[in-house]
């Protein structure tokens, strides 16, 4: 019985010693995060889609802050995110990467063919922004307002019932080019 207590005490002392060493090492050798990277990462949409060429939003934020990467490569965030990052870094805003001024690619949204959906939830698990709703063995649907069109839900679908389709243009989503609209100033004549 005495040997058991000695073994318990020895293991407890070893655990306490190693815990103290690990606690000291975690504080002594801690790596401080760059606050600029944190702020950029908060601005990015966290869709982790990889359209910028990086595996996620955090690596892209690090590349912007540390490597001088362009701030205009986030497709899901679009112009709003690019403008916020430009304001944060005090740099000049740039046109979105790959976007020709005259020819903007149509915004895409995932659409589920609900007649063929088997309710496997693989698309829900793949969606980084939780834009797909449904339950196991029940019909799923996409909330188009939340969908970023990242295409991550298409491949996991075993029945191939998910496709990306362009969003229909409405007066609210239309990008009005006010510089090309002809404006004529009509002089006002005052008659007494």
From Swiss-Prot:
Compartments it resides in: Cell inner membrane
4Fe-4S ferredoxin-type domain span: 108-137, 138-167
Chain residues that bind [4Fe-4S] cluster 2: 117, 120, 123, 157
InterPro entries xref list: 4Fe-4S_dom (IPR007202), 4Fe4S_Fe-S-bd (IPR017896), 4Fe4S_Fe_S_CS (IPR017900), 4Fe4S_Ferredoxin_RnfB (IPR050395), Elect_transpt_cplx_RnfB/RsxB (IPR010207), RnfB/RsxB_Proteobac (IPR016463)
GO MF entries: 4 iron, 4 sulfur cluster binding; electron transfer activity; metal ion binding
Keywords from the UniProt entry: 4Fe-4S, Cell inner membrane, Cell membrane, Electron transport, Iron, Iron-sulfur, Membrane, Metal-binding, Repeat, Translocase, Transport
Keyword Transcription on entry: no
Positions of [4Fe-4S] cluster 1 binding: 49, 52, 57, 74
Gene3D superfamilies the record matches: 3.30.70.20, Electron transport complex subunit B, putative Fe-S cluster (1.10.15.40)
One Gene Ontology CC term in the entry: plasma membrane
GO biological process, any: electron transport chain
Cofactors named for this entry: [4Fe-4S] cluster
SUPFAM superfamilies, sorted: 4Fe-4S ferredoxins (SSF54862)
Region Hydrophobic, annotated ranges: 1-26
Assigned EC number: 7.-.-.-
Residue ranges annotated for the 4Fe-4S domain, each copy included: 32-91
Main location: membrane
Cofactor note: Binds 3 [4Fe-4S] clusters.
Role this protein plays: Part of a membrane-bound complex that couples electron transfer with translocation of ions across the membrane. Required to maintain the reduced state of SoxR.
Family membership noted in the UniProt record: Belongs to the 4Fe4S bacterial-type ferredoxin family. RnfB subfamily.
PANTHER family reported for this sequence: ION-TRANSLOCATING OXIDOREDUCTASE COMPLEX SUBUNIT B (PTHR43560:SF1)
Quaternary structure note: The complex is composed of six subunits: RsxA, RsxB, RsxC, RsxD, RsxE and RsxG.
Protein name: Ion-translocating oxidoreductase complex subunit B
Organism, as annotated: Escherichia coli O127:H6 (strain E2348/69 / EPEC)
């Amino acid at each position: 019985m005495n040997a058991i207590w000695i073994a318990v005490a020895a293991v407890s002392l070893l655990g306490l010693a190693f815990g103290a060493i690990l606690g000291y090492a975690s504080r002594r050798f801690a790596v401080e995060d760059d606050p600029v990277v944190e702020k950029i990462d908060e601005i990015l949409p966290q869709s982790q889609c990889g359209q910028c060429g990086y595996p996620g939003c955090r690596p892209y934020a690090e590349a912007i802050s540390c490597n001088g990467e362009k701030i205009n490569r986030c497709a899901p965030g679009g112009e709003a995110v690019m403008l916020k990052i430009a304001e944060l870094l005090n740099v000049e805003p740039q046109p979105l990467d790959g976007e020709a001024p005259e020819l903007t690619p149509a915004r895409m949204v995932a659409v589920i063919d609900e007649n063929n959906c088997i309710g496997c939830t693989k698309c829900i698990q793949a969606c980084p922004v939780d834009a797909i709703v449904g339950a196991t063995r029940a019909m799923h649907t996409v909330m188009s307002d939340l969908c970023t069109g990242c295409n991550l839900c298409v491949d996991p679908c075993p029945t191939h019932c998910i496709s990306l389709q362009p969003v229909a243009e409405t007066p609210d989503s239309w990008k009005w080019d006010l510089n090309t609209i002809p404006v004529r100033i009509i002089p006002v004549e005052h008659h007494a």
